[in-house]
Design a protein with these regions (language model features):
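FIC/Doc superfamily catalytic core
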Residues: 1-28, 36-228, 232-295
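Double-stranded DNA-binding cores of transcription factors and transposases
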Residues: 32
Length: 295
């Protein structure tokens, strides 16, 4: 029995073009060609892709660093509090800026301290405060090791989406489009079953936490379950799961937003998870380095 290039691409999570290249390079045992079509054995294994060895090596480094971090003395309560305060300001600034919030890093810090910025929208103030509250809520979930669920996701969105009370923590009921994106979010009637499937797939996955979360994040944003606030909610979910697994939270920088956007397109157009995986791995690695340098 054979499968087509398209079937192999879907099975292995790569692009049709990449499958054809692997066929032409003789990297798939038993493959044959009939005219312009490739016939691939149904039981063929996905060939190793040397292009992603760098990411695989980085994951190994990350695992070693995490093991080393776990073996060192824990931070004191005061140290943790100080580091969290600093992280929350930058994280709130970057995550909101990616979505169009106009507050600068300094202004975000001031707003989170209870000040009001003249000539800046109330919405921007509320987004900053809501994001901070959502992150501290996520920390509480981590302490209690609360399993990821639709209820948890809706609670986080409720805090994030502070400026639109009627839409907080509620799945959207209208169709939406993401400007400039190469993927169209699902129709409203599909949100519930898609979210259930996403969570089932995530729970049953045996992948390393980083590619596992890279895939979850892209799929979550692709479903786009809420009318707005999906990006901020999605990035908080990534940090919820990273911290539950014993890793430090990451902060995707506003300055890296183009690479971040491109990682979504790479997955939706070419079925290539590598770009998002590499982005996440790089951030986790940097955070581990900063923690190890302190201990």
């Amino acid at each position: 029995m054979y499968m087509t290039v398209k079937q192999a691409a879907e099975k292995w999570g790569i692009s049709d073009r990449r499958v054809r290249i692997l066929c032409s390079e003789g990297k798939i045992p038993g493959v044959t060609r009939e005219g312009r079509s490739w016939k691939i054995p149904e039981d063929a294994k996905k060939p190793e892709d040397g292009r992603y060895k760098t990411t695989e090596n980085l994951l190994e480094k990350i695992d070693r660093k995490k093991t080393e971090l776990d073996s060192r003395r824990p931070l004191t309560e005061g140290e943790v509090e100080r580091l969290t305060e600093e992280f929350v300001v930058e994280y709130t600034y970057n995550s909101n800026a990616i979505e169009g919030n106009t507050l600068t890093l300094r202004e975000t810090d001031m707003v989170l301290r209870g000040l009001t910025i003249d000539k800046k929208p109330l919405k921007d103030h509320m987004e900053a405060v809501g994001h901070k509250e959502a992150f501290y809520f996520v920390q509480d979930l981590v302490k209690e090791q609360v399993p990821l669920s639709e209820s948890v996701i809706k609670q986080i969105h409720y805090l994030v989406f502070a400026d639109k009370k009627d839409d907080r923590g509620v799945y959207r009921r209208v169709s939406v489009r993401i400007m400039g994106a190469k993927h169209e979010p699902v129709q409203p009637y599909l949100i519930q079953p898609k979210m259930e499937q996403l969570l089932d797939d995530y729970r049953n996955s045996t992948e390393h936490i980083i590619p596992r979360l890279a895939r979850f994040h892209i799929e979550f944003e692709g479903i786009h379950p809420f009318i707005d606030g999906n990006g901020r909610t999605g990035r908080l979910l990534v940090n919820l799961e990273l911290m539950k697994a014993g890793y430090p939270p990451i902060d995707i920088k506003f300055t890296d937003r183009i690479a971040y956007y491109n990682a979504f397109d790479e997955y939706h157009v070419k079925h290539n998870l590598g770009a998002m995986e590499k982005l996440f791995a790089g951030y986790v690695n940097e955070r581990l380095d900063s923690y190890l340098a302190m201990l």
